[in-house]
From Swiss-Prot:
Keywords: Cytoplasm, Methyltransferase, rRNA processing, S-adenosyl-L-methionine, Transferase. The gene is rsmH. It comes from the Bacteria. It comes from Citrobacter koseri (strain ATCC BAA-895 / CDC 4225-83 / SGSC4696). It is an enzyme of class 2 (transferase). Pfam families: Methyltransf_5. One of its GO terms (biological process) is rRNA base methylation. It catalyses: cytidine(1402) in 16S rRNA + S-adenosyl-L-methionine = N(4)-methylcytidine(1402) in 16S rRNA + S-adenosyl-L-homocysteine + H(+). Gene3D superfamilies: Putative methyltransferase TM0872, insert domain, Vaccinia Virus protein VP39. This is Ribosomal RNA small subunit methyltransferase H. Belongs to the methyltransferase superfamily. RsmH family. Specifically methylates the N4 position of cytidine in position 1402 (C1402) of 16S rRNA. S-adenosyl-L-methionine binds at residues 36-38, 56, 80, 102, 109. Coiled coil: none annotated. The keyword rRNA processing applies.
């Protein structure tokens, strides 16, 4: 089957790559290859001795990566949460000079109706980043308990009508199992008593189900923890998030790792004991938001936040 060419405009492209502080001979990871915007820019800044390891769990992204014929570049089909395993297999633990993550769903995934990510286009109710693994959104919604669906909508979509929508989903699936995105969008819209004139009523539900089906927040947390073991001293983390749930995790991680161990005031400890606790693992270098010009050219960039941190010598 021919793969349609869906356009993808990389958000905060230069800023995210600048955040890595590229060394020509460095070793870098692009944990979310997508359509290769960040990877291609990183490669353009690497010298002959540099290396780039890219990761993506979307088979379409892996197919796109085959167009890069460069001995410094390699692509792995898998989740970025397993980056420590990929690095360990290549005996590069503690030698990585930078990790870039561009979180969430990409424009090609949203724009391709066959992937089932968008309520704006009718397609199979799938939503998997990797359609070859795990349950689709339709399969999960057909088997999940009403209370579990409500919890997911509330937790990952911050949906105030979560219980009402969950009940409507379960009732509809009892009558006729939903298999299409349009069906889910219609059920959610009908179950939503108060409409936001600036937002489709299914927006939060689709976000929540997608995050749950792909274990997105757990993936982020695991990747962040793994980064501490794989980064070299001075290595950079450059992470773009697109909604508050993602950014909250990244912000909390960078803040906690920048503070070092917290010792209660007045607790008697020797200098040797304090040393054993270790110091700060990261140094937070701040955050960036897209400028007005970028948002005008690419409205999806509006909610993006780039956070950068550097591995310390601790």
């Amino acid at each position: 089957m021919m793969m349609e060419n869906f356009k993808h405009t990389t958000v905060l492209l230069d800023e995210a790559v600048n955040g890595l502080n590229i060394r020509p001979d460095g070793i870098y990871i692009d944990g979310t290859f997508g359509r290769g915007g960040h990877s291609r820019l990183i490669l353009s800044r690497l010298g002959e001795e540099g290396r780039l390891l890219a990761i993506d769990r979307d088979p379409q992204a892996i197919a796109e990566a085959q167009a890069i014929n460069d001995p410094r570049f390699s692509i792995i089909h898998g989740p970025f949460s397993a980056l420590a395993d990929y690095v360990s297999e290549r005996e590069l633990i503690g030698k990585i000079d930078g990790i870039l993550l561009d979180l969430g769903v990409s424009s090609p995934q949203l724009d391709d109706a066959e992937r089932g990510f968008s309520f704006m286009r009718d397609g199979p109710l799938d939503m998997r980043m990797d359609p070859t693994r795990g349950q689709s959104a339709a399969e999960w919604l057909q088997t999940a308990e009403e209370a579990d669906i409500a919890w997911v909508l509330k937790t990952f979509g911050e949906e105030r009508f979560a219980k009402r929508i969950a009940r409507a989903i379960v009732e509809r699936n009892r009558e006729q199992p939903m298999t299409r995105t349009k069906e889910l969008a219609e059920v959610v819209a009908a179950a939503t008593p108060v409409k936001d004139k600036f937002k489709h009523p299914a927006t939060r539900t689709f976000q929540a189900v997608r995050i749950w089906v792909n274990s997105e927040l757990e993936e982020i947390e695991q990747a962040l923890k793994s980064s501490l073991s794989v980064l070299a001293p001075g290595g950079r983390l450059s992470i773009i998030s697109f909604h508050s749930l993602e950014d909250r995790i990244v912000k909390r991680f960078m803040r906690e790792q920048s503070r070092g161990p917290q010792v209660p005031a007045g607790l008697p400890m020797t200098e040797e004991q304090l040393k054993k606790l270790g110091g700060r693992e990261l140094r937070a270098l701040g955050k960036l938001m897209p400028g007005e010009e970028e948002v005008a050219e690419n409205p999806r960039a509006r909610s993006s936040v780039l956070r950068i941190a550097e591995r310390t010598n601790a």
